[in-house]
Amino acid sequence: MAAAGYDDLGKALGTDYFFLREQLSPEQLDYLTRTRRFVDDEVLQVIGGYWERAEFPWPLVKRLGELGLVGDGLDIDGCPPMDPFSAGLIQMELSRGDGSLGTFLGVQAGLAMRAIAMHGSEEQKQRWLGPMARVDKVGAFALTEPEHGSDSIALETNARREGDSWVINGAKRWIGNATIADVVVVWARDLEDREVKGFLVEKGTPGYQAQVIEGKGSVRAVWQAQIELEDVRVPLENRLPGANSFKDCGRVLVETRSSCAWMALGHAVAGYDAALVYAKRRRQFGKPLCSFQIVQERLVRMLAEVTAMQLYCVQIARLASEGRLLPTVAGLAKLHNTRKARQILAEARDLLGGNGILLDFQVIRHMADIEAVHTFEGTETIQTLIVGRDITGVGAFA
C-alpha cells in the first residue's frame, strides 16, 4: 500500500494550464467527467493488482460498455454518439488510469470496430457493432506477423477462394484480445490478385489457435497473443467487402495513431499529477520537495510538455471532426506525444525517489506502459520516415 498521505495519488488534478476545457461542449464535458469519475472511483484502487498478476480486468472492461464509453467516435447505429474530441478525451482519461484499459479500448473500438464500420457490409455492422460497443462481444485486429511489424505491408498470411468460402493460412503476433475475442479481423493476402483483404474469423472456427504472450513488462493487464491459422475456413459473407487492399487497412490505422497521441497524453498527465502531489507533500531537509528550485524547474518543464501535448490532441481532434486528418499529421502527433510522455514519466519517477518504483505510487506502471504505446501502431522511426518523406518528397525507408 502507498504510504500514509499518498492514498489519493493518481487521482485527477484536472491539469489544464491553458484553459482548454472551456472549449468543450456539454456532451464532450460529460464524456470527460464520466470517464474521469470511473477512473478515480473504480480503476485506481484495483488496477495495480491486475497489472502485477497479469490478469485481464473483466469487471472494469465490462463497465466500459455499461458507461457507454466504447465507440471511438464511430457514427454507426448501436454505438454511443460521440465526436472525435469526445473519443480522445475518453482515451486520455482511461490511459491516465491505466495503459491496459486504454489499449483494450484501442483494440476493441479503434481497430476491430472501426475496421467493420469502415469496410463491413450492413449485415456485418448490424451483427457486431452494437454488441461490441456494449462489450457483450470482444473483437481483435490481426495484422502484425512474427516477421512483419513495421513492414506489415509485406504480410505473408494468405487467403484463397475455395467454393463458397475462403481458406486462410499464416501466423500473426502481438494481437490484442486474440485469445478472448468473439470475432477477429484478419488481414491476409489474396493468392489470386496478391491484394491484402480483410476477413472476420469467428470464435471457435477450426484451425484458429491463439496463445497468450507471457512475460510482458508493459500493459500487463491485457493479453496479446500469437495466432496460428491453419486452413481456417471463412464463409464468403465474412469477408469485409470494403477491404480490398493494404490502403484500406491503412485507413483504419490513421485513426488509431491519433488515438495513441491521446493515450500518451493520459500517461503523461498521470506522471505529472503524481509528481506534483508528491513534491508538495514529501519533506526532505525539513521542507517540502517543491520548495527546492530544481524541483520547481522540473515540474514546470513537465507542465510545459503536457500542455503542448494537449494542444496537439485538440488540433488532431478538430481535423478529424472536419474530415481533414492526414496520415502524416496523425503520425507526427503520435511521434511527438509518445516521445514526450516517456520523458515526463522518467522525470516523475525520479522525483518520487525510491517510492517511484512501487506500483501503489502509480508512476512506474505508466512508465512501463508507455513503452507499448510508443511502439504499437507505428514506431517513432516509422512515423519519422513517413513525415520526413512528406516534407522532403524523398522516401528513406530503404
Describe the residue ranges of each PLM region.
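Alpha-helical transition-metal enzyme core signature, strongest for iron centers
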Residues: 132-135, 265, 269-272, 299-309, ...
